[in-house]
Amino acid sequence: MSSARRCLFGRPTPEQRSRTRIWLEDAVKRMRQEESQKWGFDFELETPLPSSAGFVYEVIPENCVPEFYRTKVLTVRTTCSSLDISSTTLTPLSSPSTSDKEEPSLMDPNSSFEDEEEPKKWQFREPPTPRKTPTKRQQKMTDFMAVSRKKNSLSPNKLSPVNVIFTPKSRRPTIRTRSSCSPY
């Protein structure tokens, strides 16, 4: 069963999709250029613009930068029972043993942006495959509440409730037949 979707204005044609995509790309490009001019920094190349007179960028040591802004290596933590963990960390393509603390350009305040190599590209390793994938089923309302079915002890062709008497000893109903009942 497919998920429900709402299409308020009808399905777009391929031409409308391409026009929308072009419009969005132009808007993003315009916004990037405005921000680049505003801050004097090329965010795509991650370098300062040469003509930026308003800002002076300088390299600072890593220990002077707050922890929030430091580059970190991400690890994935999972339980061993559900996944086969072989290696789930991110590593740079250049060398897996390089860490940010050992990198000389981060520690050397005299280095410039031009001396840097191209930025490292991070390679995501394949996520571990689950050993057993549980099948999802659509839950029912009765899964969330207790359901008790009421027994209908008196059907239309049985005796009326007037003839059912509860005795104090057994707590079971005693059913009298019409022949044994007195009218009074």
UniProtKB/Swiss-Prot annotation:
Annotated region (Disordered), positions in chain: 85-184
Keyword annotations: Cell cycle, Nucleus, Protein kinase inhibitor, Ubl conjugation pathway
**Disulfide bridge map:** none
Q: Which InterPro entries match?
A: CDI_dom (IPR003175), CDI_dom_sf (IPR044898)
Q: Where in the cell is it found?
A: Nucleus
What residue intervals traverse the membrane? none
- This protein's name: Cyclin-dependent kinase inhibitor 1
The organism named in the record is Caenorhabditis elegans
